[in-house]
């Protein structure tokens, strides 16, 4: 097979991995994956009842539900973090 025909065949097949049965796949968001990986390394869950709130032993602020352990308020059914200053 000549090189031109081979290249056209590859260019025809290549986009198929980006198309799902229901349409184009959503774009990959690296920022969310980086934040999730960082939270797994630096934060931990306060209780099984509130897996959506994370507190950190380090003084952090504004990291998608991650705040310093000493300012996490877990008195009651849910944990909350104060707003960042």
Curated annotation (Swiss-Prot):
CC annotations in GO: extracellular region
Primary localization class, coarse: secreted
Propeptide residue span(s): 22-40
GO MF term list: toxin activity
Tissue: Expressed by the venom duct.
Alphabetized UniProt keyword annotations: Disulfide bond, Neurotoxin, Secreted, Signal, Toxin
Domain of life from the UniProt record: Eukaryota
Compartmental location: Secreted
Signal peptide annotation: 1-21
Post-translational modification: Contains 5 disulfide bonds.
Function: Probable neurotoxin.
Family: Belongs to the conotoxin D superfamily.
Record note on domains: The cysteine framework is XXVIII (C-C-C-CC-C-C-C-C-C).
UniProt-recorded name of the protein: Conotoxin Lt28.3
Species classification: Eukaryota, Metazoa, Spiralia, Lophotrochozoa, Mollusca
